[in-house]
């Protein structure tokens, strides 16, 4: 497949400065227009924090109007990243390759909530995702009125059919 975008998601202020001209991730926690201004000095597109409510987004965009801001509108928020293989440690496996089996693993809490675990066999990193999926696709027109122009979808364990439906919903909301 051709590469449509070779930009890197900057997940920290250090990587943002080092990899200038890329896209900031929501991990930078852009929650006010001062942070947005700083992030725009180093990034071509800045993703606003998912923790902002509508009034906070409105305030940010009123104080720093720009056409190159983004917002996560669908996906499970990454809650934790560990530089260790959670599966290997859990199953006490030596020379473990459990994560290569493509099974879905979940962490279940005392309330029976299921947190998806993603693994990266290349660097033995584990990611724990929120048990609830954020779905703000219906609010895209409202966010567009504020001046937000980029809408991100993070897919993790969705089926092919779910993926097509999510993308179709998004396309309808942004009038593609």
Where are these predicted regions, by residue range?
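Active-site pocket-lining/capping segments in soluble small-molecule metabolic enzymes
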Residues: 1-176
């Amino acid at each position: 497949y051709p590469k449509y975008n070779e930009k890197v998601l900057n997940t920290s202020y250090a990587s943002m400065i080092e990899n200038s001209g890329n896209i900031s991730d929501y991990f930078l926690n852009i929650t006010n227009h001062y942070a947005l201004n700083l992030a725009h000095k180093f990034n071509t597109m800045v993703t606003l924090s998912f923790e902002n409510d509508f009034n906070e987004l409105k305030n940010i965009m009123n104080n720093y109007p720009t056409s190159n801001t983004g917002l996560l509108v669908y996906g499970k928020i990454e809650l934790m990243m560990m530089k260790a293989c959670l599966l290997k440690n859990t199953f006490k496996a030596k020379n473990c390759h459990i994560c290569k089996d493509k099974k879905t693993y979940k962490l279940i809490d005392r309330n029976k909530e299921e947190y998806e675990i993603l693994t990266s066999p290349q660097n033995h990193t584990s990611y724990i995702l929120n048990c609830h999926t954020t779905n703000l696709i219906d609010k895209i027109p409202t966010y567009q009125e504020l001046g937000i122009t980029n809408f991100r979808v993070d897919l993790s364990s969705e089926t092919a059919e779910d993926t097509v439906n999510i993308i179709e919903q998004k396309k309808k909301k942004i009038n593609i």
